[in-house]
């Protein structure tokens, strides 16, 4: 340890340097920590609140793919992530001895227009080329959807999956700890630069810094790069005490219905570009449930 004098008195600062420091303990930051620790890097994760306290600690958890036609690099990247997710979460949950709620349950989507029906038939063929063992089928009906809501049948894909976001964060964090990752919760970073982060608590040093602090991190990134980096979008969802087991998730009219493995079902979500309070629930959620 060494003592460093500043305007507020003496601060105690470690001389330890990490290979990687990650700002933010949401799903992206935790995933980076897990990947780095698996490669034997020393990792420190800091968060201004608790693990999974932001959008990553939500309840929706729909993991759904792009359509299998008009294939390009972005779709291939997402496909590789989704197709490998099952093995990934099995390993994470085994290491943590917790459940992320992951399950490849598939997805059904009602077809209400003939044009969409014809597109779906074409995508069925494209999936054979681009999706490997996973399918994009057109089916006549499903027990969860009334025939009047699906006049042209339904799309059924077997690539989609569910996860319980807040539980996934806890499972991933526990797995990271098993691998030696260090965590500092309730530790707000007010400044970062190459090789260093700092706050009222002191400073830490790392060869690489990853900023994964959600929409709140954009302000710091805007200042660091001197260009607008992004903004946050708020989503509201409802958790219902309805047990649908391992039924496929439903996507219709911009709304997801996701059955979870704990016997609950989530409906979501809103998409709000203009908002003032991130955790407030309002009439928009009621409107979504009514739909």
Describe the role of every protein-language-model region.
Residues 1-20, 38:
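Extreme N-terminal leader/targeting segments of oxidoreductases
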Residues 13-28, 44:
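Beta1/beta-strand and adjacent pyrophosphate-binding region of the FAD-binding site
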Residues 20, 33, 43, 209:
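Hydrophobic anchor at the start of a short beta-strand
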Residues 28-39, 48, 57-62, 67, ...:
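Active-site substrate-recognition segment that forms the wall
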Residues 61-144:
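Dinucleotide-binding Rossmann-like beta1-alpha1 core, especially the glycine-rich loop
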Residues 69-70, 98-109, 135-179, 270-274:
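Helix-loop-beta segment of a Rossmann-like dinucleotide-binding subdomain
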Residues 76-83, 113-116, 155-174, 279-283:
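Short beta-strand to alpha-helix junction loop
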Residues 155-195, 199-208, 212-216:
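Helical element adjacent to the flavin cofactor pocket in flavoenzyme catalytic cores
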């Amino acid at each position: 340890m060494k003592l460093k004098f500043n305007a507020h008195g003496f601060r105690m600062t470690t001389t330890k340097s990490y290979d990687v420091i990650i700002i933010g303990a949401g799903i992206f930051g935790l995933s980076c920590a897990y990947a780095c620790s698996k490669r034997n890097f020393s990792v420190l994760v800091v968060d201004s609140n608790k693990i999974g306290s932001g959008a990553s600690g939500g309840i929706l958890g729909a993991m759904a793919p792009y359509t299998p036609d008009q294939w390009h690099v972005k779709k291939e990247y997402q496909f590789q992530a989704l197709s490998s997710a099952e093995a990934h979460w099995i390993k994470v949950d085994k290491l943590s001895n917790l459940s992320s709620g992951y399950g490849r349950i598939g997805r059904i989507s009602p077809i209400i227009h003939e044009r969409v029906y014809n597109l779906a038939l074409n995508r069925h063929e494209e999936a054979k080329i681009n999706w490997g063992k996973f399918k994009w089928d057109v089916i006549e009906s499903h027990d969860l959807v009334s025939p009047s809501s699906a006049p042209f049948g339904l799309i059924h894909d077997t690539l989609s999956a569910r996860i319980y976001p807040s539980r996934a964060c806890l499972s991933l964090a526990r797995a990271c700890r098993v691998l030696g990752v260090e965590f500092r919760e309730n530790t707000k970073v007010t400044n970062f630069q190459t090789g260093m982060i700092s706050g009222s608590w002191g400073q830490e040093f790392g060869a690489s810094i990853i900023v994964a602090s959600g929409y709140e991190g954009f302000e710091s990134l805007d200042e660091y790069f001197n260009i607008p980096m992004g903004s946050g979008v708020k989503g509201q969802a409802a958790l219902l005490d309805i047990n649908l087991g391992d039924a496929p998730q439903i996507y219709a009219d911009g709304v997801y219905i996701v059955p979870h493995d704990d016997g609950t079902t989530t409906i979501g979500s809103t998409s709000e570009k203009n908002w003032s309070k991130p955790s407030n629930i309002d009439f928009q959620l009621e409107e979504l449930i009514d739909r």
